[in-house]
Design a protein with these regions (language model features):
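Structural recognition of alpha->loop->beta junctions
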Residues: 108-127, 269-277, 335-350
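Mobile, glycine-enriched helix-loop/loop "lid" segments at the mouths of ligand-binding/catalytic clefts
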Residues: 143-148, 360-383
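Conserved beta-strand positions
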Residues: 6, 72, 220-222, 280, ...
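Short, solvent-exposed turn/loop segments enriched in Gly/Ser/Thr/Pro and often Arg
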Residues: 55, 102, 223-227, 256-259, ...
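Acidic, low-complexity intrinsically disordered segments
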Residues: 2-214
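Radical SAM [4Fe-4S] cluster-binding motif and immediate context
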Residues: 152-318, 325, 329-338, 366
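Radical SAM enzyme core and accessory elements
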Residues: 2-6, 13, 45-51, 63, ...
């Protein structure tokens, strides 16, 4: 029997980490590592499996000593923790495999790893598992040809994680997004033709989690849940029946594009199925900047009215906002502050523009000689830029810092909460 250790690197303090609120609610992390739980499902007979999430517990030397192979999955924001894990594996002579968005976008940074997985793994996972079984691991596994059918994805191994330590569970229904935002890395990794699981497959995964006894919040992690509206409507119709039969054990939230506001049927299906919140990439209230960034879907209707339409349906809107675009007007910080207040989006992720690897933005800035040599941190809230901005950098960073302080000043934050509750969310 071979021992396979799955290790999830630690997140720094970011918007998505929620580290400072965990002690208040008796939890240790927001979400379990879905990718590793899914990869683990391919390892069946002949393997002992263990998963260590460094966000809820320490990776001990004893864990590494136990392992025959160490498998990791990471995003770029986890890079510091990941490279520490790789170094420890090397020191102890343990083969370490690195996959996920970070190695996919920056494979050149993984010379210390035994093997890297670039891209989606479904197409070659059976070979990968057999190579581990036979101790003949290749240095690189990479997708060739078409992107994989999600019907190949197995049910995640929720039994490998300590469910009680997380605020929310998560599953994936689709990959890819039909839009073409210049700064986005999702369309580079997953493509612009959304691929989905079948309703039956997705509900079977829900059954697997339901059978663990978990009840509560549930994040559907799709980068654009409504990328294929026909498929998502069919799934939601089945999900409504499932929720009713089970007594509505899960409260869902997800990420979507703002054109959700123009589809009353979809809004009704989502709220009926038990969705209570949606994260939207709002980016900026400046229409010219949206067009320059390729975010044309945000310009076809009033952004503020679209947000209120979604809120009035019963979905709280949380949003992502960006400053640092080339075409930002001089008064962008005041525009953002006013828009966030009027739109009643208290839970706003405001960040500096970041040029992520292998994006249209990075390619353009490279051609213009504006990329800095430093690797992107993946954290757009640490007051650093990995490119030379049009605006004076000191002015940009200070304006961003003040914007952040303004929108999260208690008076402004709770004012937005009050506006949302009293004037936009429906009364029940």
């Amino acid at each position: 029997m071979q021992n396979i250790l799955f290790v999830y690197p630690k997140f720094p303090v970011t918007y998505w980490g929620f580290q400072h609120i965990m002690p208040f609610i008796g939890k240790k992390a927001a979400f379990p590592p879905l990718a590793l739980m899914t990869i683990a499902a391919w390892f069946k007979e002949g393997f002992n499996l263990k998963l260590v999430d460094c966000n809820i517990e320490k990776l001990r030397d004893a864990d590494l000593q136990w392992a025959d192979y160490v498998l990791t999955s990471s995003m770029i924001v986890q890079k510091d923790s990941l490279h520490q894990i790789i170094a420890r594996c090397n020191q102890m002579g343990k083969p370490v495999v690195c996959g996920g968005p970070y190695p996919t976008s920056s494979p050149e940074r993984f010379k210390a790893a035994t093997s890297i997985v670039v891209g989606e793994a479904e197409s070659f996972m059976e070979k990968f598992v057999e190579d581990i079984r036979n101790n003949r691991l290749l240095p690189l596994y990479k997708i060739h040809g078409d992107k994989p059918d999600l019907s190949l994805t197995p049910k995640p191994r929720f039994d490998l994680v300590k469910l009680r330590y997380y605020t929310s569970m998560l599953l994936q229904f689709s990959r890819g997004c039909p839009f073409n935002c210049e700064f986005c890395d999702i369309i580079e990794m997953f493509g612009r033709t959304p691929r989905t699981k079948s309703p039956e497959q997705f509900l079977a995964e829900l059954d697997g989690l339901y059978d663990t006894g978990y009840r509560g919040k549930f994040f559907i992690v799709d980068d654009n849940f409504i990328g294929n509206k026909t498929k998502v409507k069919a799934m939601l119709a089945e999900l409504i029946g499932w929720q009713r039969r089970k007594g509505f054990p899960f409260q869902f939230y997800t990420e979507a594009s703002v054109n959700l506001a123009q589809d009353d049927e979809l809004l009704n299906l989502m709220t009926t199925a038990g969705f209570s919140m949606v994260f939207l990439g709002l980016e900026t209230p400046d229409e010219n900047t949206l067009k320059q960034a390729g975010k044309n879907q945000n310009t076809r209707h009033s952004l503020e009215e679209s947000i209120h339409k979604i809120q009035n349906s019963g979905l709280e809107v949380t949003g992502g906002f960006i400053v640092g675009f080339d075409s930002d007007p001089e008064n962008i910080f005041e525009l953002q502050k006013t828009f966030i207040r009027k739109a009643a989006v208290p839970f706003a992720m405001v960040g500096l523009l970041m040029a992520l690897p292998q994006t249209q933005l990075t390619r353009r800035l490279t051609r213009e000689g504006r990329m800095r040599p430093e690797e992107s941190t993946g954290n757009n809230q640490n007051l650093e830029l990995n490119f030379i901005p049009v605006r004076n950098q000191q002015s940009l960073v200070e304006g961003y810092r003040q914007l952040f302080l303004d929108i999260y000043h208690p008076k402004n934050y709770f004012g937005s909460c009050r506006e949302l509750i009293l004037n936009h969310l429906p009364r029940k």
